[in-house]
């Protein structure tokens, strides 16, 4: 009996060993175990100088890979796996090592005598397990941060919060890609490369990979590249598949500003650089220097605003990028204010339905228009009448307006502060203070959390903005002094809670490592570090903010050379709530992009690192494109996915006020708002399946931060090599003096980050200012006399002002 069991075990072990191939790198940097069906059972890789790491993988089940859709593969010989030839199309995978990298050779063949037109797609599932479900595993899961098809090749990368990066590259064109969204929830299972795909596809994609001729075979080479951080991606991809890569540190500029363009190429000959303006005109760029395989160009933004397309071209390869030359920031804020009135700000249970009041009020602070302000006030009063219980002054619980969601309360504090800033009526600030007290009394727990949603409520940010206007009043009123003290203590308690919870706080809906929770956490920690520079935890606030920002990078389009998406955080479940499209797709940028990234400006002011300033301006420019550049119309969010079949909710022109669903394909485009026509019946507060309900007004989150951080400010950096870069202004040297011209008249402050002492002259709209500045960082301008917006980054100047 024992002998039979032993023989059975030996036979099982032999079968298992025979059926599994093990491919090891000659350099010892990776090891792949592969099943008899060609599916990776385990993959270990070394990322930089770290020890070997197991890449999470789907080795069985629906998302197992690598695999072809609807096709089983079988082992043909060692490391080679093929499908049966009885199908019209046959498929195969061969695993190999090339130049030290794990390389897959993929083949699709038409075995028939007729052309095979691809009606859906020929998908190659990677099998990387991207499901962020277990908080204990969040930091080791590789998220599909960037996938990008180009006309002649493909590249992208998966990044884990712990910083490990797995880049992918193919020297062959791949038609498209898609992600394995799990239902309508908050998780993604894996990613697929669509080797062949029907049109339409974005113009940057190959436009001819939708069929196979009789007996035609197509081949693709796919290279896996483990890296220690995303900064290595452009050069590593360029080297791995010998293509030109375009790297942009900033993807936006105002007229007259200089943008750096880096072309990384291993060919030994500089790729041809072609820059086309909005009307197709050729735009010059100057080659500054060549360092190894890095060709560094400078482009000065012309006076014509719009999209500038960049092409780096060799004999075989064609790589694209773009830069957005923007209009003045004030134009976008003004349009957002107008659009907030054209769209309905809705009586609804979710703050996302009425956030347009932010744009309506903040635009009036900088660009006053009495008629527009009166219209805003009338609409707000009608909204308030329906939503608020006149007996308590807060929620109308009979209508179940919003009493269980702390974020509705915190955002209302913000709206009331904006209303006060626009109207200067003290009763509006009184109301904001009462609502802040309500947030604290009803929702703040003994541990400082706002009902567990400390980051998501952004309660500390909104109360800090309220305190900005309370500070002067504390010097004259004991009542305001007591209010300020209560609010200050609440913010301090919330700060300690975030310092403890970090980026692992609660989220709404299905739990995951979420862009909004993690992003708001690091942004709030940066705010606390900036407003408490001498506090006992200031250094810890800053340290944790920087660490979380780095982890959050995996959920951010931090590297994409596309100004429409740069800096957008990656979120994919909002369309069903915001614009009633019942299909998951990436929304990036989405409204919550700015709430996730507003701390970048604070980190720049704390560290002086140009990287953070570029993050801030790149993401603001991406989000500002929610305003159509030509028409001024507000759109909801950008969808990076190249091809998504949806039932889109559109206006039914045959039935007034009603909508209908139509078949559409969405791909790399802005999705329109629906609140201009999808309206709530008067005096009603709809549920989410009733007429008029939608959450697309969350898009106005972008313009809150534009008003605070971007409208009044310009920035100048002197780099260690002596070169100068500007944001929201232009600069000229006149001998030893720097002459600064702000981009628009609403700029009232210029921030300098200098390597040495210098004289400066600033041509503000109302007067010129002169200063002699030492090495380091300095603000020059009106400062707190420009008191219109809560400028949290000037907090310490505020509280010490006499």
Predicted regions and their residues:
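Beta-strand-rich N-terminal accessory domains
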Residues: 19-105, 109-176, 181, 221, ...
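Beta-strand-rich recognition/accessory modules
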Residues: 23-26, 84, 123-125, 157-252
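Beta-strand-rich interaction surfaces with strong enrichment in secreted/lumenal proteins
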Residues: 92-95, 206-212, 284-287, 297-299, ...
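Catalytic cores of extracellular degradative/oxidative enzymes
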Residues: 327-605, 609-626, 630
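Extended acidic/polar, glycine-enriched regions
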Residues: 267-331
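Terminal, non-catalytic domain-edge segments
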Residues: 21-22, 230-259, 267-269, 305, ...
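Sec-dependent N-terminal signal peptides
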Residues: 4-14
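Low-complexity, Pro/Ser/Thr- and charge-rich linker/hinge segments at domain boundaries
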Residues: 132-134, 235-258, 319-353
